[in-house]
């Protein structure tokens, strides 16, 4: 996912 928030949730 290109973005910041969703990537953070994924991590």
From Swiss-Prot:
This is Thrombin-like enzyme albolabrase. Its EC number is 3.4.21.-. Monomer. It comes from Trimeresurus albolabris (White-lipped pit viper). The keyword Hydrolase applies. The lineage of its organism: Eukaryota, Metazoa, Chordata, Craniata, Vertebrata. The keyword Transmembrane helix does not apply. Glycosylated. GO terms for molecular function: serine-type peptidase activity; toxin activity. It comes from the Eukaryota. Thrombin-like snake venom serine protease. Releases both fibrinopeptides A and B after 90 minutes incubation, but only fibrinopeptides A after 10 minutes incubation. Clots fibrinogen with different clotting time depending on the species: bovine > dog = human > goat. Fails to clot both rabbit and cat fibrinogens. Expressed by the venom gland. Belongs to the peptidase S1 family. Snake venom subfamily. Its main location: secreted. One of its GO terms (biological process) is proteolysis. One of its GO terms (cellular component) is extracellular region. Keywords: Blood coagulation cascade activating toxin, Disulfide bond, Glycoprotein, Hemostasis impairing toxin, Hydrolase, Protease, Secreted, Serine protease, Toxin.
């Amino acid at each position: 996912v290109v973005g910041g928030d969703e990537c953070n949730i994924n991590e």
